[in-house]
Amino acid sequence: MATATLPDAGTASRCQATPTVTVHDNRLLAVRVIRYHRTDDEAADERIERHSFSHTGFPLDSSDARLADSGQSANFRYQCSLSGRALATASQDAGASQILFDIEGASVWNRDALGNSQRFAHDPLHRLSSVSDNGVSSEQLVYGETAVVAGANRRGQLLQHDDPAGRVSTPAYALAGLLLTEQRQFLGDDGKTLETTVYTSRYHYDALGTLRQLTDAVGNRRRQTLNVAGQLAARDLQWAGSNDWLPLLQSIDYDAAGQVRHEVAGNGVVSDYDYEPQTRRLGTLNTTRPGKPLQALSYQYDPVGNLLGCSDGTVSRRFRRNQAVDGNQTCQYDALYQLVQATGREQAGQQTEALPAPLPIDDTDLSAYTRTYDYDRGGNLSAIHHQGNQPYTLAMVVSSTSNRTLQQSDGLTPADVDAGFDAAGQLLALAAGQPLGWDSRGQLQTVTLVRHDDGSSDQENYRYDGHGQRSQKTLTTRTSGTTRSQRVRYLPGLELRDTTQTPDGGSASTVETLQLLQLDGSGRLSVRALHWTLGQPADIANDGLRYSLADPVGSSLLELDAAAAVVSWEAYYPYGGTAAWAARSDSEVSYKFVRYSGKERDASGLYAYGLRYYAPWLGRWINPDPGGTIDGLNLFRMVSNNPLTLRDPDGLKGGKGYLFMPIVSPDIMDMAIAENTQRLLVNKAPFDVLLYDRDNRRKLHSLLGDFRKGASDSAFEQQIVREMGFNQYNTDVELNRKMGKGAAIKRFTSAPKYIRLATSQMSTKDITTSQILSQLKENDKLHILAHGAAGKPFVLDELNNFMSMQDLAFSLYKHDMPDLPLRILLKSCHTADPVNISNAQPEVKIGGPAALAAAQSLRDELRKLDYRRVQVVGYHGAGERYGFLDDPEAHHTRKIGGIHGILARSQKVVFSCATPSTAGGATFIRR
């Protein structure tokens, strides 16, 4: 077995005596977070993050150490409603914004720092019906109340959505509400009228509601085969007009923990994964084709999971300019786990937004490099010092009043930086002569690449759908009297890429039409398929397959063709720039669009992450985090400045989460399934499930087996819908009213499918053998699943088997849970209630009962074991297992007013181990 975790004396020395300390007031509110930073052997720098709260306990402002110590305004200032929701937010990074909610908790109006406003209208069932931007209608939604077509199952479903990209129609659903047909029409160039072409995608499911086949908009079909455990077993592709299936993934095997162990790609390439037994971290990855190794990767980590290095045994050591150049990459971190040094190999030239020219496949003209990184006290990357073929320093200038940052040029000072951003914190230009244009929703709309003497410009333009995802991209360039336009239309599993040319004074003609299929593989494997209907390059075969092998953060390292020959390879700097790449032909490599972190690289050099854009040569985002403070008070920082260990899948970032079942029973298993169903419904990866020991793990797998048998029954959908809906709501009308918030009706009807997925994808670990608790990091969350009662110091199952908070705390301690700023979320009923207040009015003050809330009891037991940085989160009221269908981002929902009451997000109460128990205080329950 692989041994991947190594002692790292350098990191240990830098982290010595650098705790994170949270200070609470007498209301148990965190008013200070103190961190200690050290890069070398110097004295630790104390950094204090400050938070203040109103007399009702709601946030007023938050400041990081840099702005607070320099006397600047707080990073964030809030004005909250009486129920505690932030109605006005003033951010130094993102500007001032306001938002209003209706009585159901849905947003009805918002305004950003530029004065752009949105209004949201709802129908009588409280489903989103229209959106207007700055007073102009931008979205319309139509539901199937009257448009009844036999066999189409359209009643109550979303039928048509007119959005900023055009129109999406969904004319047919399965009986259980699964989408069968989706049609997209794009807006024309005038931005007002629809194109006549309708692109239709079709979905096919098995009896369990699992997607088995997708037919894309041009008729290509891809299918997947599952094993008896519901895990992916194979994938195939059938080109439109063909009867033959091409294997993309021939076979795949898993270990007992559900991790990929062995896979065979469609081109015969074999990948073998080996994991460290104690941590389940990937230790080695060997990839071979018949007769030749392609990759022999070994990974090393420090004890907390930071990547220390990666070596590739297939790369021979060579010497250039008296320096060894090999396949080894190393990393070092400071006391806050920010990357401070990295080594690797590169080709000649300074990193810019442009790609270097590709080398021949067998070229050995590479040099070793070392990069060191400097950060300021607010977590901003302030300098990159590069030692290599061409030494240089890339300096950044950070605003004195915010975290906005520009690359140093022409004597730029901190006072000048804010002029490079608009009031909402959106970058105004990539460089001189390259302005950026933003739409009213804060989405990048235009990038000007070059301005010509005749007044024309080379530009890239973008359009987005109603969910904020990119639907079209158009690159327009002008050379030698000819305008060339390259347009990409994004469809489910398919990109349509068309190129037209227009000579001055002439008419446009299409010179290339490419269908690019994005096909999922497994593990580190992904596949692209290229089909030309016009303009096929002479040196590239049509209907070609490209197999891409990725690194731990998803970056494409090695690209192979259908015969397993190398098409290209690429190496990256830690923050995403291309350090070196090689290709067997310039023509082939021009069709490589997905690179760093598995994201598409645009002509500007920016990477499109879905919710925002990333500039790899700057190591930061070009606009503030739409998720707010999910990754801290710095809204521009990339993955906590730890880009080799952490990955941001969509432009947001947060800690890891785990589900922990202290007791195993059918009811608690259902809770775990519901938790992961919620995550799948909002396109998040399911959490791993932690159990005490192997016996509990075997018991859970036995229960899961019984559940899967029941899930194969034809009545499963109706049973689940009945349990989720009619047991929770009293009438059809109330169900539709409560579940009809925008896309919530789709969440409800598609839940059975995701329940099956949550069951089949459930990965379990026992804390005795995996040592997973010892690997928890700052900001990680441990969700405790069980039943509970107000004022009771224990958790239990439906048969009244119970575990005391003392035993629960000791078990976490016994299995080496670290004393870090992580959160334990008690998901039982009434975990913040010292008495049963489930029928209380929306806002009630509770004062000093003798009993302690369950979360408070667990906090006290952890304190007895010398935990001081862990936080325990409790929730008011009796939890609703499927309440997330009403509020998909809520950790805990409850009913106020009994069985006929209102379903609302529970207010959480945080009990910090830094503060001893108190018998008084005030708790406010929020609707």
Residue ranges and their predicted role:
Residues 654-810, 915, 922-927:
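Glycine-rich short-loop/terminal segments
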Residues 564-581, 590, 605-606, 611-612, ...:
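Short turn/helix-capping motifs enriched in Asx and small/polar residues
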Residues 40, 68-76, 86, 93-94, ...:
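Acidic/glycine-rich beta-solenoid
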Residues 772, 778-884:
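Catalytic cores of nucleophile-dependent amide-cleaving enzymes
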Residues 1-49, 54-55, 175-178, 184, ...:
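Thioester-forming pentapeptide GCGEQ
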